[in-house]
């Protein structure tokens, strides 16, 4: 264990998001090599035995054993930060117990996203919402969530446009990849030669979570964005990357050049040293046929931030309607990468109890 890095663990390490966590944390400058946690089915196996991602498992973790430990056991082992890839329903009580024992949790699960005192973060959009956590009781950890995978990319693309356009309403239709259902995902016979126009609870999550993230903080309360946001969701036969068709009905009528400048110039984390933050976080394409999942899902610079940028294209402005396509990597920006970036922000703000490093 490195003495200048924070001890960590991954909850649900064998899963699709868990493996992306392992990839992102294997050589992280602030977080130490994680303890890999699994359930009864995978416990005791090596990470390489359960690996499903296209790239090989990171060498630092390939031979690591998947362990079964309790929250108390993790706290006794000195773990300060956990990254949760547990399924919703399972995650809630485990995350609560970890926080009670002083272990901070950065969660990809839905269980606590709408809790009043729990930040629901996309750092480029609402970093100030981290203050919802306030001053915690002595010995308690920090709990931070990232949003639904489609909402994560959507709000990032909308953030520079909301003050410029003052939306009356926003409509989004999503074309979501198979990996959004986890591994092994959707049965092949259900999706081959097909589009499935329903994903359980997805539309409600996008609408509710986006309104909260784009809302305004006053003390420890969030006033949700006041404009309606309406979502339609479909599952399509792409492997990774969620594509979204977005229409904004605007109150203001800036020039198209102002809209493009707002998207290109948006980089609110540029002054922070957050290793997983992409610069810029929005990549604007002018080709008639972009963005595409196959070509654009790994957008993001520097190399550690691959998959963390959103790509915006087919920008069409006929006031009061702005139309565009938005693409994001559902497992990186919309999953493990979002949680890691949240942890980097919390560390930079000095909000991880027992941290090694941080600004204060």
Please provide the spans of the model-predicted regions.
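Charged docking surfaces used in two-component/phosphorelay signaling
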Residues: 179-360
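N-terminal Rossmann-like NAD(P) cofactor-binding subdomain of oxidoreductases
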Residues: 1-191, 195-198, 222, 228, ...
């Amino acid at each position: 264990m490195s003495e200048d890095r924070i001890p960590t663990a991954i909850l649900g390490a064998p899963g699709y998001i868990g493996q992306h966590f392992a990839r992102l944390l294997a050589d992280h400058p602030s977080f130490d090599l994680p303890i890999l946690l699994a359930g009864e089915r995978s416990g005791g196996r090596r990470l390489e035995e359960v690996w499903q991602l296209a790239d090989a498992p990171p060498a630092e973790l390939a031979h690591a054993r998947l362990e079964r430990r309790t929250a108390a056991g993790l706290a006794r082992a000195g773990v300060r930060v956990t990254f949760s890839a547990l399924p919703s329903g399972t995650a809630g009580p485990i995350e609560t117990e970890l926080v009670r024992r002083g272990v901070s949790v950065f969660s990809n699960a839905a269980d606590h996203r709408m809790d009043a005192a729990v930040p629901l973060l996309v750092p480029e959009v609402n970093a100030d919402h981290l203050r919802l956590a306030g001053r915690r009781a002595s010995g308690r950890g920090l709990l931070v969530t990232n949003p639904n995978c489609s909402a994560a990319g959507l709000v990032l693309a909308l953030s520079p446009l909301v003050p410029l356009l003052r939306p009356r309403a926003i409509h989004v239709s999503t074309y979501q990849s198979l990996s959004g259902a986890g591994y092994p995902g959707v049965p092949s016979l259900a999706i081959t030669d097909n589009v499935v126009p329903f994903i359980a609870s997805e539309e409600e999550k996008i609408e509710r979570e986006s309104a909260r993230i784009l809302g305004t903080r006053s003390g420890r309360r969030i006033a949700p964005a006041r404009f309606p946001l309406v979502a339609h969701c479909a599952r399509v036969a792409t492997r990774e990357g969620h594509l979204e068709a977005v229409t904004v009905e605007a109150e203001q009528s800036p020039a198209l050049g102002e809209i493009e400048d707002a998207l290109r110039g948006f980089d609110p984390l540029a002054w922070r040293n957050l290793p997983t933050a992409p610069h810029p976080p929005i990549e604007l394409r002018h080709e008639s046929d972009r963005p595409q999942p196959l070509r654009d899902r790994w957008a993001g610079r520097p190399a550690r931030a691959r998959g963390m940028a959103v790509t915006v294209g087919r920008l069409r402005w006929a006031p009061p309607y702005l139309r565009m396509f938005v693409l994001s990597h559902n497992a990186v920006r919309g999953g493990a990468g979002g949680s890691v970036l949240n942890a980097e922000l919390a560390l930079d703000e000095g909000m991880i109890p027992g941290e090694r490093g941080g600004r204060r």
